[in-house]
Amino acid sequence: MTEDEDFIAQAFERVRREAQRRNGRVPDLNNRDAFRRTTPRPIGDRANGGNGGGGGVDKRRRGRPTGPDGRYKPYVRSAEPLGAILNREIRSRGWSRDIAAGWVTSHWAELVGPKIAQHTKVEMIKDKKLFITCDSTAWATNLRMMQKQILQVIAEKVGPDVIAELRIFGPQAPSWRKGPLHVKGRGPRDTYG
């Protein structure tokens, strides 16, 4: 044996003694499983070479956990999907009807079709009543005739208790008022000849 080999053997022997002092297990370099991570032995296990003092392995682990090969374990994310969280909050706060009503307002063209949506406008929703204004009196009349079908489509899409009634209005009559001040007049006159 040369001097270098003897020095290496002495250093390895010191490492083995220190390892035995700390946790009692010394890896066997000839064994393939020597580099696998093992679970720490309890402090003070005298039967397997522990010293019973405070030199054992602390059971608390710090940092990121690793697998048997020493690589970091992937983080396990157990977060709920965002949709599930939102649905739970909407139900718990009682917003289901309000959100359904908002959906009716924003998807009006999808509910009644593009042609009708072009000539109508949803003004507001109040107490299960949908207020709609139309471009002309003819469109208001047609929409009143289609009221039952529109309510059925709304009930299919958002639920039966969201909208119960449609209030359909024609266009606003022209106002002859000009300026901020007004004196009550004698009513409309025959101004069209």
UniProtKB/Swiss-Prot annotation:
It comes from Corynebacterium efficiens (strain DSM 44549 / YS-314 / AJ 12310 / JCM 11189 / NBRC 100395). Belongs to the UPF0232 family. This is UPF0232 protein CE0005. NCBIfam families: PRK00111.1. Residues 17-74 are annotated as: Disordered. It comes from the Bacteria. Residues 47-56 have a biased composition (Gly residues). InterPro entries: DciA-like, UPF0232_actinobac.
